[in-house]
């Protein structure tokens, strides 16, 4: 968990009135340097209250930071971004779910009504729903915890 970074997707620029939107835009300006995204582990380390937290608290804080880093200025997450996070940041829990009706229903909901966005509570429910039905959770339950 510590050291994981959220990656962002490249967004192409389309100039209004450009007859060829797929062509790369040209500019006489020097390219701007984009600030580097700070890793989740460094963001966690910067929160003083988290220094003495339990693993569970750090796990929830990590989820909250990933949500915040991916959400818009209103604190809402686009459904397409939520789906991308499931496929990139939560893939081990989602793996093997493709044939399960409930999983297909969840993905279908993310594909429909894309104008609706998720708040943090909805995002957590989404993650928990996939976790509960995942094969990985079964493997975790089978881990030996005592000698």
Swiss-Prot record:
Keywords associated with the record: Cell projection, Cilium
GO cellular component terms, semicolon-separated: cilium
Location(s), subcellular: Cell projection, Cilium
Record has rRNA-binding as a keyword: no
Keyword Membrane part of the UniProt annotation: no
Annotated region described as Disordered, given as residue ranges: 1-32
Composition bias, Basic and acidic residues: 8-17
Chief place of localization: other
Domain of life: Eukaryota
Entry-linked InterPro entries: EF-hand-dom_pair, S-100_dom, S100_Ca-bd_sub
Gene3D superfamilies the UniProt entry points to: EF-hand
Example of a GO MF term: transition metal ion binding
Miscellaneous information on this protein: 'Sentan' means 'tip' in Japanese.
Role noted for this protein: May be a component of the linker structure that bridges the ciliary membrane and peripheral singlet microtubules.
Protein name: Sentan
């Amino acid at each position: 968990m510590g050291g994981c970074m959220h990656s962002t997707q490249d967004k192409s620029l389309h100039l209004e009135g450009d007859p060829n939107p797929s062509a790369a835009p040209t500019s006489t300006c020097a390219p701007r340097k984009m600030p580097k995204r700070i890793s989740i582990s460094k963001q966690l380390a910067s929160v003083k209250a988290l220094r003495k937290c339990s693993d569970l608290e750090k796990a929830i804080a990590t989820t909250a930071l990933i949500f915040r880093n991916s959400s818009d200025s209103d604190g809402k997450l686009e459904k397409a971004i939520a789906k991308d996070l499931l496929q990139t940041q939560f893939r081990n829990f989602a793996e093997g779910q493709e044939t399960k009706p409930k999983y297909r229903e969840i993905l279908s909901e993310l594909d429909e009504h894309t104008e609706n966005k998720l708040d943090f509570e909805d995002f957590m429910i989404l993650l928990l729903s996939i976790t509960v039905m995942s094969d990985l959770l079964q493997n975790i339950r089978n881990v030996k915890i005592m000698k």
